[in-house]
Amino acid sequence: MFGMIKNSLFGGVENNEGKLVSKGEKDGVAFEEREYEGGKFVSTEVSGKPFDEASKEAVLRLLKYVGGSNQKYAGMGMTSPVVITSYPAENETLQPNVKVLLRIPSQYQADPPVPTDDTIHIEDRESVTFYSTQFGGYAKEADYVSHAAKLRSCLGPDISYHTDHYMCCGYDPPMKPYGRRNEVWFIKNN
């Protein structure tokens, strides 16, 4: 357990924020278009629970994996962002199911350790282009929903992106009280 905490939370974080393509601002809301490199990711899903509870459970599973709960007992260190795939509901909330992803650290991309938890999977993901907006604080469901609405308004009807889901991203460990970075990503349609 200590290894999980030490390696996942206190160790160096490999940041993967993507390559900036363009940026803009509308009605006081800044947004960017960025390309995010493909590669190997570790993922897990939680269903049947409210977004905040499901996200926390899924993130803890992945922290255990990168902290050494894998067949190599490798404490890999943390990457950011933590990417939570969320699914909008009809009533301005998110559906009670999430898929959480972490990019496997660079030094393990060629041969990632096999998870010991059968709810955790290694997957190859293609590069994507997305539209994003950033905000601070400890993000909860209501924050992501609010900022997704702002991003949707900024992009307007002429920009094409996936509407059945979006990504809720966090870049910081839980013990960082100030200067926190969260984002909402809309995946661009090709």
From Swiss-Prot:
GO cellular component: cytoplasm
Coiled coil: none
Superkingdom in the source lineage: Eukaryota
A Pfam family per the record: SOUL
Localisation per UniProt entry: Cytoplasm
Main location (coarse class): cytoplasm
This protein's UniProt keywords: Cytoplasm
Record's keyword annotation contains Cell inner membrane: no
Presence of keyword Transport: no
InterPro entries: Reg_factor_effector_dom_sf, SOUL_haem-bd
One function term, GO molecular function aspect: heme binding
Domain-related comment: Forms a distorted beta-barrel structure, with two helices that are packed against the outer surface of the barrel. Porphyrins are expected to bind to a hydrophobic patch on the outer surface of the beta-barrel structure.
Role: May bind free porphyrinogens that may be present in the cell and thus facilitate removal of these potentially toxic compound. Binds with a high affinity to one molecule of heme or porphyrins. It binds metalloporphyrins, free porphyrins and N-methylprotoporphyrin with similar affinities.
Family: Belongs to the HEBP family.
Oligomeric and partner information: Monomer.
Protein name: Heme-binding protein 1
